[in-house]
């Protein structure tokens, strides 16, 4: 396609359909076409090259209008295709003229190369591209992880995950990014620009995609469905993360210990265990946290804020996840099943913790004493032993605790509350853990098995005590005579000899 040197118009790279052709497209094709047109146009306005465009002062206004009539026509078409009915501001409409660009830009229809010497553009057929998506064909394979992609540009972006390349750097703060779109989105943090506003609640967003995803909160729309279990999601990334549960894929590996994770955020959080880094500090009490969500949950303790209420019983919670977990108590739903023993759980985290019984995995290690734990919460609880901190005090008796959950459990002693009832015998309990242990009496379940002799136990604590027979470990020592015992109860009984009771 030959054009004037250094000048490319939006019409040169946009794919257009006649009215007759448009009628033959189904809704999915029209939606894809709309998204493609938006991306193409967004790439053009993001080039920010209008300052290099020089209008010929000898040209009449009429001549200029004739030259750019096609661009305006296509822009109007995009506006009509937009879900909002009008997506372009006046400023954006003025940015459809482009000049020179040093680096190539890749999009849905091919690769656009703009240089000062020549302009080339290779178009791919829109409908053949759509057909490839429909058929699930993936032509470009990553040699590192064998993942395949429909477009070469997507493969190029993916390869930067393996190489660590981040060629797009923010001029304000120097933060690098793998994709130019990520840099553009990040730059709006510095400018404070949030041009996309939700008409339902007034919340504003930096990018259109965030607004589209947010609006699904109001509409309840969940267009992305898992083919394995039928669970639906608002955002495609949520579906992609969820599918790793079924595939077992854990692409994010810790270079320190080799542990792998399904999500990049989980790897980032895990790596702070090695560095002991706690970036997020509470301004109220100075307590620091490994990750932002932990800080936000903690801050609600100071404010007393519990915005999430259960419609069934009225109980309120600080975070939405707690409400979701609580609601499964009313529904009785237990969608997570252990493949080893068939036991089902309300929460995926409960299943993961349970599976460590079978694998004997204890992935969380204390950097102070090197003791290992099967869950992160156990590690956090243990670490407060070393610092001696007990920030949670009971207003009734003044007893202090390391964890808020310990204080909550303790307070039920004063109130006499026993909210957890066994459905078999109606016996009530103060703690859920007590109810869980009690249930095994009715079921006869003994999930904790000794590897040395095969004997099974109802509780993990029983297994731990039993294993000391094989190891010879006697951790409880008498201060009077230095005699050691396997169990604390044996030590207590022995000490009565010295006291004369």
UniProtKB/Swiss-Prot annotation:
Transmembrane regions listed in the UniProt entry: none
Zinc fingers (C2H2-type) by residue: 140-162, 168-190, 196-218, 224-246, 252-274, 280-302, 308-330, 336-358, 364-386, 392-414, 420-442, 448-470, 476-498
SUPFAM superfamilies: beta-beta-alpha zinc fingers, KRAB domain (Kruppel-associated box)
Gene Ontology CC: one annotated term: nucleus
GO biological process, one term: blastocyst hatching
Function field: May be involved in transcriptional regulation.
Entry protein name: Zinc finger protein 14
Species name: Mus musculus
Gene that produces this protein: Zfp14
């Amino acid at each position: 396609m030959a054009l004037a040197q250094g000048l490319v118009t939006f019409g040169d790279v946009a794919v257009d359909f006649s009215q007759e052709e448009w009628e033959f497209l189904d809704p999915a094709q029209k939606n894809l076409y709309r998204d493609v047109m938006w991306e193409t146009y967004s790439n053009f306005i993001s080039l920010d090259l209008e300052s290099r465009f020089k209008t010929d002062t000898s040209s009449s206004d009429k001549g200029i209008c004739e030259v750019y009539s096609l661009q305006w026509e296509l822009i109007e078409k995009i506006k009509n295709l937009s879900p909002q009915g009008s997506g372009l501001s006046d400023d954006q409409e003025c940015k459809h003229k482009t000049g020179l660009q040093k680096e190539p830009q890749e999009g849905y229809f091919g690769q656009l190369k703009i240089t000062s010497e020549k302009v080339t553009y290779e178009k791919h057929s829109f409908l053949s591209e759509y057909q490839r998506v429909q058929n699930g064909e993936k032509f470009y394979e990553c040699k590192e992880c064998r993942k395949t992609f429909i477009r070469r540009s997507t493969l190029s972006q993916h390869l930067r995950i393996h190489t660590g390349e981040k060629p797009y750097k923010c001029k304000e703060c120097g933060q690098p990014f793998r994709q130019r779109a990520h840099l553009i989105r990040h730059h709006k943090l510095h400018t404070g620009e949030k041009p996309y506003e939700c008409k339902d609640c007034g919340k504003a967003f930096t990018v259109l995609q965030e607004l589209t995803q947010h609006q699904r909160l109001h509409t309840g729309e969940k267009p992305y469905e898992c083919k394995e279990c039928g669970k639906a999601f608002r955002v495609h990334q949520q579906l992609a993360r969820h599918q790793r549960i079924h595939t077992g894929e854990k692409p994010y590996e810790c270079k320190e210990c080799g542990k792998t994770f399904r999500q990049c955020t989980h790897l980032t959080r895990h790596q702070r265990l090695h560095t002991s880094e706690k970036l997020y500090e509470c301004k109220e009490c100075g307590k620091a946290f490994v990750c932002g969500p932990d800080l936000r949950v903690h801050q609600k303790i100071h404010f007393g804020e519990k915005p999430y209420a259960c419609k069934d019983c009225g109980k309120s919670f600080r975070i939405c996840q707690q409400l979701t977990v609580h609601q499964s108590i009313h529904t009785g739903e237990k969608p997570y099943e252990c493949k080893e023993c068939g036991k089902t759980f309300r929460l995926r985290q409960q299943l993961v913790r349970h599976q460590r019984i079978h694998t004997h995995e204890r992935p969380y290690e204390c950097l102070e004493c090197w003791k290992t734990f099967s869950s992160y919460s156990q590690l956090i609880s243990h670490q407060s032993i070393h610092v001696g901190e007990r920030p949670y005090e009971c207003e009734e008796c003044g007893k202090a605790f390391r964890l808020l959950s310990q204080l909550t459990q303790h307070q039920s002693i004063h109130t006499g509350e026993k909210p957890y009832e066994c459905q078999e015998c109606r016996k009530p309990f103060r703690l859920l853990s007590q109810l869980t242990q009690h249930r095994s009496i009715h079921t006869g379940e003994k999930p904790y098995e000794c590897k040395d002799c095969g004997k099974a136990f109802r509780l993990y604590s029983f297994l731990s005590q039993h294993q000391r027979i094989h190891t010879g470990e006697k951790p409880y020592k008498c201060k009077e005579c230095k005699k050691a015992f396997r169990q604390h109860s044996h030590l207590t009984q022995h000490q009565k000899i010295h006291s004369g009771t």
